[in-house]
Amino acid sequence: MPSWQASVLNRLLTYVARPSVSRGSAKVPLSAIRQRLLEMDRRLLGWLPELKVEHWPLSHSPLIHYQLPQPREVSLFYIRGGGFCFKTPHAHARFLADIMRRSLADCYVPDYRLAPEHPFPAACDDVLEAYRMTLEHCDPDKLVLMGDSAGGNLALSLLLQLKQLELPLPRACVLLSPALDLGITGDTERILAADDPLFTVESLLRLRGAYLAGSNPMSERVSPLYGCFKDLPPILLLAGTRELLLQDAERLQQAVLRDGGRIEAGFYLNMPHVFPLFELLPEAMEARGQIAAFIRNNLLL
């Protein structure tokens, strides 16, 4: 049974957040929505004074390094979500600080370029360059790749590209509500019937179009669900059952098992998109504990 906090959050998302990114704002430029979200993120969440932040310049966008005043036994490479068009640095920093505490980790975050100003493959290119720099600072056997939503897409795409380029793979991978099939080849009836508290089909199509800008949605780099998952590190996959993107997670689980890979999946009843970021939810705390346990178990801490 979902918590009362989850029920309240779902109502708030449905009546407050969803209209701001759906049909009612179709004529509002994505850049204006981005600025509104950034301002809300800054005002509502603030910063964590104990979090040390460094920005390391790369070709187009920086690599951000987060540290806490604690021993470091593992490193995270986290790709933030935001529909390829937005970012909420404060919300993600608060979430990451908790995962870092639980895992005795530092964290590397690529501040990749955003659509529509920078469509595919800009984000993929930035993430790969940031990963290469991260390898200069940490052992891949002590590195965990993570990503949520669009960042989950970029994380799995990166994993497949690393294998193709024969670059060092991380020890494990964590995906939260990943958007993996931009070709939208899943069950159409289920997609249209989904009661997602945050997104509508129209809003997802708009973000998808801004990112693709005419690129082939069936490309493995755009839609990593179409890749081969043999010889990849173990994956933890978490999603909520009220998501429009739930099928992406379910199909990834099936595909990884088909290819003989290792995947642990958790589908949380009635949870919204990327629910582990909402720190007031008991289910989010449970998911964070699951993430930390997965990291410990796979890095032999």
Each language-model region and where it sits:
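A glycine/proline-hinged amphipathic helix-loop "lid/cap" segment
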Residues: 1-68, 301
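Alpha/beta-hydrolase superfamily serine-hydrolase fold, recognizing
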Residues: 16, 20, 60-64, 71-301
